[in-house]
Amino acid sequence: MIFVTVGTNEARFDRLLAAVDELSDGTDLFVQHGPSSIRPAGATCADYLSFDEMVEKMRQARAVVTHAGVGSVLTALLNGTRPIVVPRLQRLGEAVDDHQLHFGRRAESAGLVTLVEDTAGLPRAIAQHQESPPPPPRPDERLVEDLRSFLTEAVGRKDG
C-alpha cells in the first residue's frame, strides 16, 4: 500500500492529489486528503486521521508520500520510513511562503527524504522507492544540528 497524506493543513493540496489520481491503475492507495476536492480513483480515502491512525498507515505502507510539513516528515522518519516529499509552493497559492520547499530541500540534502518538487516526477520516485527501498534513516549529530538550525531560522523568520 502507498500511503499519501496532505497533513492537517486547512489549505487544499489538489496538485499532489491530481498526481496521485494518475497513479490509480490498480495501485493500492490510502489517501488522507484533508479539505482537497480530489479523491483519487480506486483509493481508500479519509478526510483526516488521528495521530495513531497515521502512524499505523505509515508502518503498513510500502511507500509514504507526504507534503513537506515538518510534523508529517518527522512522524515518517521516527517510524522508520524515508518519505517521498512534495512541498506546497507559494507561487501556486498552496502556502503563504516557501517554508515547505526550503525544509524539503534541507531534508533531502541530509539524506532524509526523496524530494519531488514537480509532481510529474512522482510516479518515478514511487517506482524507484518500491524497486529499491531506501534504508531507514539514521539520525546523526549533523542531522540533528541541521534540523535544529533550520527550525531556528524558520521560527526566526516568522517572528522577525
Tell me what each language-model feature is.
Residues 54-94:
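A donor-sugar binding/catalytic signature common to diverse glycosyltransferases
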Residues 45-48, 113-122:
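Short acidic-hydrophobic, aromatic-tinged amphipathic segments that line or gate anion-handling sites
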Residues 11, 49-59, 67, 94-98, ...:
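Residues at secondary-structure transition points
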Residues 82-117:
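Catalytic binding pocket for nucleotide-activated donors in carbohydrate/polymer assembly enzymes
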Residues 28, 60-64, 111-113:
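Short active-site oxyanion
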Residues 124, 128-160:
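C-terminal amphipathic helix plus adjacent low-complexity
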Residues 1-60, 101:
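Donor-nucleotide binding loops and adjacent catalytic segments primarily
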